[in-house]
Amino acid sequence: NGPFSLDITDSFFLQLKNKFRFVGFNQDCSNRPLSVIYNDFVKEYKYDRYFFFDDDTNVTDGFLSSKTNNSIDVSLPIIKSITDNKAYYPRVNNIVCEHDIFLNDSDYVISIGSGLMITSKLIDKFNAEQMTLFDERYSLYGVDFSLFRRIKMLRTKNIQINIEIAGELCHSLSRVDGCESTFRIRERSIDVVLTKILYPTENGFTNYLSILKVLIKTVARMDLQGLSILTYVIKHRAHPRSISYLLKRKYN
């Protein structure tokens, strides 16, 4: 996904072609929202299982062999930082999980998208509720978490969703592995504000306070452009890039 094209003679792509029977190569330099890309991916290709990986993830040799449970809807790996080899995700009931486990219906889990495996059974359950898996009001940060927030919504309707944690991956986590750029700080701020608006906690005051803190920090950094972006997000309840893309799709 843009903004720059990739070469089909790329060495990694050629290695994949030599290893697997079929490797598709799709790219879009329009820099579509990640949520839209994910949702379009599972709509276009009909398979039993779907895996998502970031380009800064190291996949271990035994990763796929840990994904053998046919009764699950979602499988998540333990995510360790490339820098310090510590586990940071998944978080089950706000505690980092560091071992393989089958989750209870009452457990609330969040994790990053890399290494995520979803099945066609999960997609069918979302389709039955006329919901997309990933919230397209998010564009970058927050896209992966939106899946788990939506799973929680389905569970409140007594819809059974089986989730396991199995295997592990090493991933470059920007907040752990180095200083964040202005771009990433802005994107994380958008994520916080959007989440407090779209998936608020029961304590309304806490939601408003969290948004206010983000705005104050943005002002303290003298980031007037960032403040303008956040004001736009609060008004339209979506990421600017998501709004732009969804409007184009609506009228095309």
Label every PLM stretch briefly:
Residues 1-29:
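Acidic donor-binding segment of Leloir-type glycosyltransferases
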Residues 28-45:
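Glycine-rich, basic loop-to-helix element that forms the pyrophosphate-binding segment
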Residues 48-58:
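Short beta-strand-to-loop acidic/aromatic patch adjacent to the donor-nucleotide binding site
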Residues 63-76:
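Conserved donor-nucleotide/metal-binding helix-loop-beta segment in metal-dependent transferases, i.e.
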Residues 75-92:
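Short beta-strand-to-loop element that shapes/binds the nucleotide-sugar donor at the catalytic cleft/hinge
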Residues 99-118, 139-140:
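A recurrent flexible, glycine/aromatic-enriched loop bordering the glycosyltransferase active site
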Residues 122-127, 136-165:
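A short, conserved alpha-helix in the catalytic core of glycosyltransferases
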Residues 169, 179-206, 227-245, 249-251:
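Catalytic core of nucleotide-sugar-dependent glycosyltransferases
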